[in-house]
Amino acid sequence: MRDAANLCWKLAAVLRGQAPDSLLDSYAAERKPHVTEVTRRAVLVGRIITERRPWLAAIRNHVVRALTRIPGANAVGQKFWWIPEAHYDDGFFAAAHPALGRQIPQPTVDGVPLDDLLGGRWTLMHTGAVPVGAAAWAAAGAATLQITEPSLVRWLADHKADAVVLRPDGFVYAAASSGGRLPAPPAGLNLTTLTGAPA
């Protein structure tokens, strides 16, 4: 799913003539490390599951049984073993900031899933006053959303941001701390029509 989400909006931008072909080069830079890590974890878990030496299999079975008795251990284990954090170290992003390349959490906002609220659009999300540089994003066609939902406010604070600009795939393209200026929108992209929806 993340592969499709990453590639869909980029292909749409290139096919609509809204972005250069070079935008597609960011796909491998962003996705390859994540896929490599998922594969590494799957191989490791596979080795644990298929262990045939009786003494190691007995230890494995004992540990797994013990862990299943701990409330919440299954959810934590799935995240630890299977699903690496959605974070890109390299790719199509603005100037450096701790929030860049991270996927925004997906809570429900006023009874609506955040994904549905964002609608696959470029979106400027902020917690307080409209940040410096927001006018350029609005002029380029990005939606603006002031957030008060506690988990989103906490997530932004944890990543030292009062405002973030989300790409259509829900990853942070740009961010600004309190009183900071948002970087300018990417040149040449028409953010009004550039969404994660099919062309």
Question: Locations of the language-model features?
Answer:
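Helical substrate-recognition/capping region of FAD-dependent monooxygenase/halogenase enzymes
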Residues: 13-199
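Extended, hydrophobic alpha-helical segments in both membrane/secreted and soluble proteins
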Residues: 1-12, 23
